[in-house]
Amino acid sequence: MNMDTNDKEKKNEGIDPAKLKQLNLAVDALEKQFGKGAIMRLGDGSAVMQVQSISTGSMTLDFALGVGGLPRGRVAEIYGPESSGKTTLALHVIAEAQKEGGIAAIVDAEHAFDPSYARKLGVDINALLISQPESGEQALTIVETLVRSGAVDVVVVDSVAALVPQAELEGEMGDSVVGLQARLMSQALRKLTGAISKSSAVCIFINQLRDKIGVMYGSPETTTGGKALKFYASIRLDIRKIAQIKDGDEIVGNRTKVKVVKNKVAPPFKSAEFDILYGEGISAMGELVDLAVEFGVVKKSGSWFSFGQEKLGQGRESAKKALREDHALFQQVYIQVRELMTGTAEIING
């Protein structure tokens, strides 16, 4: 008798044999009708699924998400104020998916996609699928078709606020359209979520913030498109600018904070901070310096940074420059930080 049979017998101890027989018949019938895996015991080896993910392009955010990035087969929402880095973050996810040989698509409902900026962030423009739909229904049908194909790794919808229902487009200016978009999103996500969960795709919805009228207590901010996306999203990321980055008097980027507001695959409410530089995106060097100091790989004494016996320079910018110019040094620091992060992540996630 093999181990699997022994395990099954242990799990079935105490269950009425007649009930067990009826259960097995029901499971067989369901699998015949809907396919293998339609229903399974959570304790079975076949049911234990490792959460695969796609990197966000930020080591700190990947760490905060608990699974090394955005989980595949799930819906993610990235929201925040205007010009906070929502699209930049989504483009980094696309670039990371393409680096792994994946296929990515962007549904540009805002009709504002900038190919030259995406290229600077590492996106392969020639391989990227892009659609600029005329209505919300068309946009969400395109998303569903791409996901059901099973060939796409990342689909980005930019943005929920721009998903205008067909009825609103065909109506007159000033017509009452209360709840139309929320209803559209609710219907679409009911269909989409099942299709996405059976695929290896990450579906990212970029969303904007609006102010709720007449709110006296609590946050007056809310996202567009109703409550369906909040419910169906496995990951919700709140992205904000917290400071400007200056080179002398010139503003060259923003210090950005991302809070994991919702996480169904790991502990939520963690946050990540990193630099987004204009024309470059997430600053990998700046992030590595910050993490190296945090994990004790790089020592900071006053304003001086050092790695072992080697001085990297005075000030954060000098340390970044030293890592950028010495690839072997960069690799050493990166590997040590990565090992410490992975070890810490395993301890935290138990």
Curated annotation (Swiss-Prot):
Gene Ontology BP terms: DNA recombination; DNA repair; SOS response
Role, per record: Can catalyze the hydrolysis of ATP in the presence of single-stranded DNA, the ATP-dependent uptake of single-stranded DNA by duplex DNA, and the ATP-dependent hybridization of homologous single-stranded DNAs. It interacts with LexA causing its activation and leading to its autocatalytic cleavage.
Residues bound to ATP: 80-87
GO cellular component, one term: cytosol
Keywords of this entry: ATP-binding, Cytoplasm, DNA damage, DNA recombination, DNA repair, DNA-binding, Nucleotide-binding, SOS response
Annotated compartments: Cytoplasm
Record keyword Nucleotide-binding present: yes
Homology family: Belongs to the RecA family.
PROSITE patterns: RECA_1, RECA_2, RECA_3
NCBIfam families: tigrfam_recA
Species name: Chlorobium limicola (strain DSM 245 / NBRC 103803 / 6330)
Name this protein carries in UniProt: Protein RecA
Pfam families: RecA, RecA_C
Main location: cytoplasm
Keyword Transferase: no
InterPro entries from the UniProt entry: AAA+_ATPase, DNA_recomb/repair_RecA, DNA_recomb/repair_RecA_CS, P-loop_NTPase, RecA-like_C, RecA-like_N, RecA_ATP-bd, RecA_C_sf
Single GO term (MF): damaged DNA binding
Recorded name of the encoding gene: recA
